[in-house]
Amino acid sequence: MLDIKRIRNNLDEIKAAMARRGEKDFDLDAVVALDEKRRELLQQVELMKNEQNTVSKEVPKLKKEGKDATEVMARMKELSGKIKELDGQVKEVEDQLEYTLLRIPNVPHPDVPQGETDDDNIEVRKWSEPTHFDFEPKAHWDIATDLGIIDFEAASKITGARFALYKGVGARLERALINFMLDLHIEEHGYTEVLPPFMVNRSSMTGTGQLPKFEEDAFKLPQKDYFLVPTAEVPVTNMHRDEIIEGANLPLSYVAYTPCFRSEAGSAGRDTRGLIRQHQFNKVELVKFVKPEDSYAELEKLTNNAEKVLQLLEIPYRIVRICTGDLGFTAAFKYDIEVWMPSYNRYVEISSCSNFEDFQARRANIRYRPEEKGKVEFLHTLNGSGLAVGRTVAAILENCQDDEGNVKIPEALIPYMRGIKVITK
């Protein structure tokens, strides 16, 4: 959520930032007008309360002097009624203001490239060269089906489209990747492991920005008003909702494995086969709470931590800087890590690493106290996939296949596969 003072004092700047995003869904002038109305009402309430205090002191004084206090008491009653009425108006205006502020996206960082779609994202760097074969590479869903390690038909029968049923070596591969990623981030990168609930409440979804704007994208349990987690970012960030963290303890770095659940409401017809776009998938998530002055340096570290997974698996990838039109609602700046997929003959996103600055912290009321014991401030939050597990399985199947349909296990993963080096029929 944006600071209303920032909008009020830098209205033209915020309008320009929203224009960069291509946002036209709200009227910032109306937001400022609501804020002005709120402040006017609060001023009226304050004046009346001051008068009420003054008048209340006259009553005992008049009674002590034996004078009639009826008129003064009537004024007190009148003021009390007006204050109550104004308090109701203040609450109504504040609710309207919060409703609007919760729907305004984050301001893009000046270094975010201008653009409308993912075609306008800018490549920052590449690691290794794209994998090429002297045979026609198979798509990962065909490899998995032929090897008998993922059964898409059974998953569709059990549930529906966009689900996968892993079995045998396929299930072991998925589990091996989860453990490999967790161990790397905990033991090598210094993250603290968290195993959070897989369901969250409405306040948690609002705190990280999924609600209220994107409720249709979430899986909801209406009987409890709970939501299945779309990403571990939601429960892990909300661990510190309504808390003040000592500055000396920052940064806080967490890693969490969870299944993730997404309706993919806007993805009809896209990636309908395979593991790229599922309603349920596993993911290892990295979340950081940092001081504002450190947040962009910490974003570089987080991105490096995420890409290290692919380096150790020896899978080609690239890093792209996301443009304004592809940035998403909550991020001020974002990198995508895109893995090379031979059957697609292109790079496919496997991780997004974002700096939200104080956007989520304001929504979730997460603050820190500087070491010099100054005024508490909102901290910055970061997160990134480290990595999406199903997409990593897909990348291994496609990049490590041979002309006979077998798949070689990356060297770093063999200890987690109990010595299995090749998946064969």
Swiss-Prot record:
Pathway note: Aminoacyl-tRNA biosynthesis; selenocysteinyl-tRNA(Sec) biosynthesis; L-seryl-tRNA(Sec) from L-serine and tRNA(Sec): step 1/1
This protein's UniProt keywords: Aminoacyl-tRNA synthetase, ATP-binding, Cytoplasm, Ligase, Nucleotide-binding, Protein biosynthesis
UniProt-listed GO biological process terms: selenocysteine biosynthetic process; seryl-tRNA aminoacylation
GO molecular-function terms, A-Z: ATP binding; catalytic activity, acting on a protein; serine-tRNA ligase activity; transferase activity
Annotated InterPro entries: aa-tRNA-synt_IIb, aa-tRNA-synth_II, aa-tRNA-synth_II/BPL/LPL, Ser-tRNA-ligase_type_1, Ser-tRNA-synth_1_N, SerRS_1_N_sf, SerRS_core, tRNA-bd_arm
Residues that, per the record, bind ATP: R262, S263, E264, E349, I350, S351, S352
First-tier enzyme category under EC: ligase
UniProt binding sites for L-serine: T231, A232, E233, E285, S385
Gene Ontology CC, one term: cytoplasm
Known catalytic reactions: tRNA(Ser) + L-serine + ATP = L-seryl-tRNA(Ser) + AMP + diphosphate + H(+); tRNA(Sec) + L-serine + ATP = L-seryl-tRNA(Sec) + AMP + diphosphate + H(+)
Gene3D superfamilies named among the record's database cross-references: Bira Bifunctional Protein, Domain 2 (3.30.930.10), Serine-tRNA synthetase, tRNA binding domain (1.10.287.40)
Known partners and oligomeric status: Homodimer. The tRNA molecule binds across the dimer.
HAMAP family: Ser_tRNA_synth_type1
Comment, domains: Consists of two distinct domains, a catalytic core and a N-terminal extension that is involved in tRNA binding.
Function: Catalyzes the attachment of serine to tRNA(Ser). Is also able to aminoacylate tRNA(Sec) with serine, to form the misacylated tRNA L-seryl-tRNA(Sec), which will be further converted into selenocysteinyl-tRNA(Sec).
Family: Belongs to the class-II aminoacyl-tRNA synthetase family. Type-1 seryl-tRNA synthetase subfamily.
Full protein name: Serine--tRNA ligase
Species per Swiss-Prot/TrEMBL record: Alkaliphilus oremlandii (strain OhILAs)
